[in-house]
């Protein structure tokens, strides 16, 4: 450790956000760049822990103290080598991960944690800027072929690992471009898509083949996959959204978040001039208080919504870590995202009872009621009903598992009791040679878990194809975040 007193002498400073009145007029990323000297001081706050609990918070097993120290010393090339040793895509996690490593940071027991996420992101951006992110093509090919179905973070991680191991890998994606939720689910103001494209370019040069616009299960059947490939990795995600079947659900103007967000991204990239779901001048209500709801909020603001209200059935979290969620667990606290900084009209402890129409089949308002948690369930507070006028409702209430698609039926893979694709300790499904990685097997989770799943599943596939593997396997299928 280069600065033994850094955590005591240097205060925690996170990157500043661009002014609200400026950033809501464009789709560019929210955060402003910082000087490298500032970054070095932040890296110097990493203390000489006996046991670095930040490792506990990250399923990738990132070597956090090592690359923190290297960045403090200015050894950027060695820092990116240590970072890439455990994480294929630090430019994604450095932007999109909620950083459970920071809530597990030892400094965070009684001080402000090290800005690990900020240091990670700057490490990879310095490497790209200096031309130090190069293709790592295999020395030889094994003659084995692998199909990866789905091009989100789990699928891309599995594909890159298997390609580098010498297998011939094809990644299939039903959307018109590769990237999965990274492409069309994550708004441009959180991650500009050229960030994704430059990594895909590296993967193509390594030998990974991309097949966008292919609906596997229809255009390419499960039988076709079995005949053409020696192994298949299902990385189709948890895309079956949770719905709200209440009176008025059929009214026009009610959409799932993932029906809205892709069009926002296409608009941001200039791929469409007038998206079919456009909230300019309209009143919007978002159901769900999580990250996806915040993404709908930021997108609605940039489209020019007249008002946006976000509803959450849970009570407002506390500002400080609850006593029942001690360090090093990830606490449920009140957070203000960049979108909430732009327009924060959140309502907690409320439930939607009915969608109200205008008599012409269009949405005009929603009927809500205050709730309280009693007898193990949420109960309505009598006399607390009210209406919120709105033209659009976006449901951002999470996902229940992978879609029960024709591909799953064709491959005859079994599902577990939660509706996810069943798998063994080697990430293999109930059908030999068919593996599953990411949310399709785990259930909806964080991007770091998706990448860890992709890396671990790749190791299992490599072992299945060759009888051995040197690929790292950071997690088991049954591993879960530390909870209380």
Which stretches of residues belong to each language-model region?
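C-terminal catalytic lobe of FAD-dependent flavoproteins
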Residues: 23-37, 41-45, 356, 360-414, ...
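A conserved FAD-binding loop/helix module that cradles the flavin
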Residues: 293-298, 303, 440-471
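Beta1-alpha1 glycine-rich phosphate/pyrophosphate-binding loop at the start
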Residues: 5-32, 61-73, 78-83, 109, ...
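FAD-site-proximal beta/loop scaffold in flavoenzymes
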Residues: 250-281, 374-444
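Short cysteine clusters
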Residues: 46-49, 54, 58, 93-97, ...
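Feature captures the FAD/FMN-dependent oxidoreductase FAD-binding
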Residues: 78, 140, 145-149, 197-246, ...
